[in-house]
A protein has these predicted regions:
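Hydrophobic/aromatic residues within transmembrane alpha-helices
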Residues: 30, 41, 84, 110-116, ...
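Transmembrane alpha-helices of multi-pass small-molecule transport proteins
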Residues: 34-76, 100-105, 156-160, 176-193, ...
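Glycine-/small-residue-enriched transmembrane alpha-helix faces in small-molecule transporters
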Residues: 1-40, 72, 79-80, 125, ...
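Hydrophobic alpha-helical transmembrane segments of multi-pass membrane transport proteins
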Residues: 14-26, 56, 69-87, 107, ...
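Hydrophobic transmembrane alpha-helices of multi-pass small-molecule transport proteins
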Residues: 53, 74, 116-136, 153, ...
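Specific alpha-helical transmembrane segments that line the substrate/conduction pathway
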Residues: 40-43, 47, 82-115, 153, ...
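C-terminal-most transmembrane helix of multi-pass membrane proteins
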Residues: 2-3, 42, 46, 243-299
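Membrane-interface helix-cap regions at the ends of transmembrane helices
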Residues: 2, 48-64, 79, 127-143, ...
């Protein structure tokens, strides 16, 4: 294994996962209380991310691409997650979201010609088991519409990720996705305002800031890096490694907030790491062309 070649890739993957975990914490803080509603949170998040990427693209003189399906998947993920998270809560939401992500991306891997081995399947199941152990005590019987909504959010994120495998210009594609997703969010907000006859309550500054930080800092740059990484990773590995996000959130609470490390968190973390490790075996990265030496699996 060429450690020098794999360290940058592993480091960038870790940055993406930590960014996703930070985004999860921001959304939890913003949507858990009355500071901001899901429609406005989604709007500010996507518009904030679009503005950051548009400025970056203008500086780099990268033209805006035509809208593609990935822009819709990004919008659907952001909107469905925001609306259903309010009802489901963190534990049930995480379980349903990442289950749908796994199923969608494994299906995408098969459709794309990848052939997961037994170790990949066992790894994915182990990581899912770790996630279940982490959230099991907080599960409840949710509203059926919220379950469907969160599964739709997970499927949309899975499709958005699968759609990034063949991207050659991550900045151009991510900017386009955010710009057109933001336009869809503006349309959604206009429909909601029209249906209600105007805003019902004014958002609090804290909620607006959390949505803006979520979009401009922990969404747009992180998703750009994710699109830069996806062509270098096997879809199976990319799907399974995301199951570590709730575990990172748990350990982040220990490091930053002084929350205790419970036996459930430790066991869940171990299972997720074991599962991710199994999906890294031999096929952590996409197979290279015959004339190109295949890089090693990141570790």
């Amino acid at each position: 294994m060429d450690l020098k070649r794999n360290l940058p890739l592993a480091g960038m993957t870790l940055v993406v996962l930590v960014g996703m975990a930070a985004n999860s914490l921001l959304e939890r803080a913003g949507l858990a209380g009355p500071a901001i509603g899901p429609t406005l949170f989604t709007l500010i998040r996507l518009v904030g991310g679009a503005l950051v990427l548009a400025v970056w693209s203008a500086i780099r003189r990268v033209p805006l691409k035509r809208p593609q399906a990935n822009a819709f998947w990004l919008f659907l993920y952001a909107a469905a997650f925001s609306y259903t998270y309010v009802v489901l809560g963190a534990a049930m939401g995480a379980l349903l979201l990442f289950f749908a992500v796994q199923l969608t991306m494994f299906t995408g891997a098969l459709a794309g010609g990848e052939r997961p081995t037994a170790s990949h399947i066992v790894g994915g199941l182990l990581a899912l088991a770790g996630l279940y152990i982490l959230v099991a005590l907080q599960l409840h019987r949710p509203a059926p519409w919220a379950v469907v909504g969160m599964l739709a959010a997970g499927a949309a994120w899975g499709l958005y990720s699968v759609g990034g495998r063949g991207v050659r210009d991550p900045l151009a594609h991510t900017t386009s996705n955010f710009v057109y997703a933001a336009l869809l969010a503006i349309g959604l907000a206009a429909l909601r305002l029209s249906a209600r006859g105007g805003p019902q309550t004014m958002p609090q500054l804290s909620g607006v800031l959390e949505a803006l930080i979520s979009g401009a800092i922990t969404s747009a740059p992180i998703y750009l890096l994710w699109y830069a990484l996806l062509p270098k990773l096997r879809t199976v590995f990319a799907a399974t490694v995301q199951l570590s996000v709730p575990v990172i959130v748990g350990f982040g609470g220990w490091m930053l907030l002084g929350e205790p490390v419970t036996a459930r968190l430790a066991i869940a973390g171990a299972l997720v790491l074991m599962g991710v490790g199994l999906t890294m075996r031999r096929t952590g990265q996409k197979a290279s062309r015959p004339d190109t030496p295949a890089p090693d699996t990141p570790a």
